[in-house]
Amino acid sequence: MTTLNLGYLATFRLVIQRGSFSAAADVLGLSQPAVSLQIRQLEQFLQTRLVERTGRGIKATAAGETLLAHGERIQQVVDDAIRAVNAFSHDVSGTITLGTGATACIHLLLPLLEQLRRDYPLLSVGVTTGNTLDIVRAIEENRLDMGLVTLPVSGRALDVMPVMDEEFVFIASREQQDAFRELTPEALHAQPLIAFETGSGTRALIDGWFAAHGVAMAPVMQLGSIEAIKRMVRAGLGYSIVPRMAVEQDADREGLCVMSLTPMLQRQLAVVMRQDKILSKGIAALIRLVQHPSGG
């Protein structure tokens, strides 16, 4: 390797984020030896150790921490360069098919699609909502071009590009907020919970948050719509745990108190595509907007 491999740099950042080679390999759809080889080659190129094992997994060395900081800036420069070059092209057109969850569709994707329509009026984006498993299957079968889904994902020959961490927050009606002194699993499990329906990735994540502290959930309601959940909470029928993006805007959080949980609960969203998918100008434009929504 005669130049710094940006792909290996991205793998290194993911290894540190996930805390192990195996976890990074699962996200990337690679074998653990393949991930380890990329890190070794990166270390050989830089002639220094970048990672070390601890009792809690993999962590960056001092040199690795420095590389992480530079890596974020390198990625930003690369993204800026791509955006600048593409500014000379005015023929972004065609149709993209995208799958995502209902919450991300409404609260994250909608403003991005509006911006995409302004910037590239000849580009059409068709959106399908569903759960992560169904979206990944559709991508593998080439029925969708790409997905914006929750990690982890498992699939054959997929490119996985983490784009953002999404926090989950506690919500209750403003009239009832004084009844909730602590927002821990132990304190909340006895309170009436209005939950997402069983079988969704969101429900599994919340179940896991309680289970990690030895607490079993006993929801008083299980609903499939986040808007229905918020209506029930506003009516004072219980509390819920929802993605922060669903209550980010003033109109979305009207009548609700919104607070972070202890410990914090979050998940990671990623853009997923087939590795053999041709990266059209339209797909590239949409990926850039998802990665940097404020800079589009």
Located regions from the model:
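Hydrophobic hinge/microswitch elements
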Residues: 131-136, 140-144, 149-150, 201-257
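Short helix-boundary/capping micro-motifs
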Residues: 13-31
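A late-sequence structural motif
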Residues: 108, 257-296
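Central regulatory/effector-binding core of bacterial HTH transcription factors
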Residues: 93-156
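Beta-alpha-beta core module
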Residues: 155-162, 166, 180, 227-275
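A short LG(V/I)-centered, amphipathic sequence patch enriched
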Residues: 43-65
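Secondary-structure junction motif
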Residues: 178, 192-213, 279-287
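Flexible hinge/capping segments at coil-to-helix
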Residues: 155-193
